[in-house]
């Protein structure tokens, strides 16, 4: 098996036709499939979307399982805010509109994808409601736009009898009456109708790309995400307690966004339903059932060799010099955030160099500049909304010419930069706040007198030590043309 012949896959999980064949089903994946976990938390690049894509592929093969999708990408947040229930405060004001959108996705799935329900009359009523209002084929985004155009109201006719049992409408009124009703009452009617549906089917709803519209420091967007989580929990409880319909939501959320929600009491209640994509880079004594990136790599190597049980050792000539501790694997992974995307990207760049046979240290070292440029751009996409002057701060290491510096020297240098000073003044922050934020994003770490270093991505509980020296992440060092080891 040649390193050159390995199929590493697409950079994006969506649209990767082979993903289901070489996906590594890590410990806990089966619990996600069963609905025991309904929130996937992880940094960008840890595989959240890949998990959803593989779950979707498995659902497609199950005749009694169906799914719908919701995404915040290009989502009209402004409209959602306009449709809030002004009678409530905080996250509670947005919960009703989220519930209506999610319910609508479930209903469309029941009507147009599942032919196995025995409650024909109820499903026909549901279908008539969506078709009478011309909203049968709309996405959540399109539904929201229509809600604004219609002042939050829809024709109730097909659902009137279900609404009567919940809010006490006059039962003498015609069941065919056409009237415009607020979407919150429509939600009540739909919930009542769903109680009458008898089905063995399972309905999945996937909510992804919630980071697309998230901006750090925007309290209203934070409230929107909290309200979405509340809506998911409300519906999950309702379906479990009041219906025979199996509802399985799966929400993918970036860890830096999730961390901003920790001051809300509701997040503690979600603990048992959260799966965190925390990958290990261990390679020694690693079992093929461990949550280690090497198992992802081996799965793709084995797939490329048509199941002949080839692995990392079969495609690498580990000729790294003695001063490189841990060999080629350690050299590569120390330049990542311990994310599958980073490791796979580095290997794909190495492959572009077209090594003759096995992967050698020479290939890895010569590919580092291209990888470091890519890694730097990945960081920009993740941190910019949280810390716009991150690049100015990191350029201190370029000025110094080395990957390590003292805290005092770092502060002295960033305070000479006009853009950083302007940001500090406008945000009310001090230099220590910038360092701590860089540490929390693992762009810098701590290093002690014995050369032991600490990064947040290695230990989520790690705290910045303001008495230790600062060290730049090795993945950025080549971008700045800095040495990362001494020969």
Identify the meaning behind each predicted range.
Residues 83-88, 220-223, 264-270, 350-353, ...:
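Short secondary-structure boundary/capping segments
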Residues 184-206, 210-321, 325:
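The catalytic "switch" region of P-loop NTPases
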Residues 1-92, 469-487:
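Walker A/P-loop-proximal flanking segment of P-loop NTPase domains
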Residues 43, 49-204, 213, 258, ...:
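P-loop NTPase nucleotide-binding core
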Residues 96-111, 295, 299, 345-348, ...:
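Short, hydrophobic/amphipathic alpha-helical patches that form generic packing surfaces
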Residues 89, 93, 177-180, 197, ...:
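Short, solvent-exposed segments of well-ordered alpha helices
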Residues 16, 21-25, 304-316, 417:
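Flexible secondary-structure boundary motifs
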Residues 11-12, 72-73, 318-487:
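C-terminal leucine-rich, beta-strand-based interaction scaffolds used for sensing/assembly
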